[in-house]
């Protein structure tokens, strides 16, 4: 069962010091946190240090923020949340970055 808050804290403790103004962070996942603590403070900290933070979500937008999905909370601290379910959507996201 996903626990993004725990995963973010572990990542931050191991690699947070490596994030800098030239860093782009890509977060990949459905943001379904199984009602655990969100750990969104980590994304906020990453965003303050990084050049960009983006979230790529494999679920259809119509599923976002339903049930245990907290993509809206996480997205608050990113430069954008994008539906990314296939190569076409991934390509469109990459083109936006170029």
Identify what each model region corresponds to.
Residues 44-98:
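Von Willebrand factor type A / integrin I
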Residues 27-28, 39, 52-56:
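Short, local alpha-helical segments
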């Amino acid at each position: 069962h996903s626990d993004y808050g725990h995963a973010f804290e572990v990542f931050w403790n191991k690699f947070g010091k490596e994030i800098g103004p030239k860093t782009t962070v890509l977060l990949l996942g459905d943001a379904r946190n199984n009602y655990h603590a969100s750990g969104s403070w980590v994304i906020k900290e990453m965003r303050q240090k990084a050049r960009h933070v983006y979230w790529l979500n494999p679920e259809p937008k119509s599923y976002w923020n339903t049930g245990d999905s907290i993509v809206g909370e996480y997205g608050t601290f990113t430069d954008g949340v994008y539906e990314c379910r296939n190569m076409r959507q991934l390509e469109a996201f990459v083109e936006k970055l170029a």
